[in-house]
Amino acid sequence: CDIPQSTNCGGNVYSNDDINTAIQGALDDVANGDRPDNYPHQYYDEASEDITLCCGSGPWSEFPLVYNGPYYSSRDNYVSPGPDRVIYQTNTGEFCATVTHTGAASYDGFTQCS
């Protein structure tokens, strides 16, 4: 499905460019084998979270959604990933959803961004 023009994740509003930059950053990290920050990593679709993925079947990956991205952190320069993520189809980079830990039912759970 198409990347939305914007998304609201618990009050953080991201543009289409922010979302696209996050997906591209994730794909670049994988291609370069550069993952000291442990992102991207696999996303597990938990039925209890009621997240709608608008892309094809998995595997899916998640990557931090930040302003002025893409997100990058290293052992020597740790940067918090924040609460917001973009979910994409691991093999194709197709956009699936934006999700946030803000307001989720559990500490490590997600809720869908609007």
UniProtKB/Swiss-Prot annotation:
Disulfide bonds join 1-54, 9-113, 55-96. Ca(2+) 2 binds at residues 29, 31-32, 39. It catalyses: [RNA] containing adenosine + H2O = an [RNA fragment]-3'-adenosine-3'-phosphate + a 5'-hydroxy-ribonucleotide-3'-[RNA fragment]; [RNA] containing guanosine + H2O = an [RNA fragment]-3'-guanosine-3'-phosphate + a 5'-hydroxy-ribonucleotide-3'-[RNA fragment]. The active site is at residues 41, 62, 101. Gene3D superfamilies: Microbial ribonucleases. It is an enzyme of class 4 (lyase). GO terms for molecular function: lyase activity; metal ion binding; ribonuclease U2 activity; RNA binding. After treatment by base Asn-32 and Asp-45 partially isomerize by succinimide rearrangement to form isoaspartyl peptides. Belongs to the ribonuclease U2 family. This is Ribonuclease U2. It comes from Ustilago sphaerogena. The gene is RNU2.
